[in-house]
Amino acid sequence: MNFNLSQIPERNHKPRTSGITMVMDKGLSVEEAKNFMSVGNPHVDIVKLGFGTSFVTPNLEEKLEVYRSYNIPVYFGGTLFEAFLVRNQFDDYISVCKNFGISYMEVSDGSITIPHAEKCGYIEKLTKHGTVLSEVGSKDAAHIIPPYKWIELMRAELNAGASYVIAEAREAGNVGIYRGTGEVREGLVQEILTQIPGEKILWEAPQKAQQLYFIELLGCNVNLGNIAPTEVLPLESMRIGLRGDTFHLFLNKENA
């Protein structure tokens, strides 16, 4: 940090297993990725190349190398995994990840329907090739999953070998754990947390109000994802009480 301030909550140090910030890169150029890393690197843990953008990104290898040079793991969005799966190209997906040096993989079923046991089978297979994040929740706002089912799915996917379960929100933050307005389904979140360890959940929270909710609920070391590159420093400031929304949250406290 650039100067000394007392009563700042202690953030877990990188490489960390909780307090993760996952950034969604929806199409940064190589130069933009370099510029982003020059300021964002200390506060970014994982970068996701959103949905299928990796298929159409020029100079993909060069961009991946930028993130690699900062020891930031990158993974392809779960929609790309589903695109391979629906075309019966699961083995090709593994090959593509290997060819591009991708060791983090997302397993999701937000756009397609597959039996849950089959999804868990893919998680188990991919753990042999790297770190697996599995996403729970539908991208269809009309598809409401009851809390007990969220818990059941998350538990099974963690047991299958997922390092984290991602709570679906899309890049807009208006499905899954959120209502169409972006408001948090608080009852759902709190019920999930009675059964699933918070440090194993990566909450997609693209909106500031959503990030604030989880920081207030779980502290500065909550795992948050789908953060825009331009929002990394604002989020880090909010995590440690240096933004108006959380200014008083950690004052007179030893730890977050």
Language model region names:
Residues 1-66:
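Conserved N-terminal beta1-alpha1 strand-loop-helix module at the mouth
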Residues 3-7, 191-256:
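C-terminal alpha-helical cap/extension of soluble enzyme domains
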Residues 17-31, 50-53, 75-89, 135-149:
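Active-site mouth loops of central-metabolism enzymes
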Residues 18-24, 44-49, 74-78, 105-107, ...:
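Hydrophobic faces of well-ordered beta-strands that scaffold small-molecule active sites
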Residues 29-31, 54-67, 83-92, 110-130, ...:
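Active-site-adjacent beta->alpha loops and helix N-cap segments on the catalytic face
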Residues 34-42, 58-71, 92-101, 121-129, ...:
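Acidic (Asp/Glu)-rich catalytic clusters
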Residues 35, 89-95, 145-159, 206-220:
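Catalytic cores of alpha/beta
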Residues 49, 106-111, 159-174, 221-238, ...:
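Glycine-rich phosphate-binding active-site loops on the catalytic face of alpha/beta enzymes
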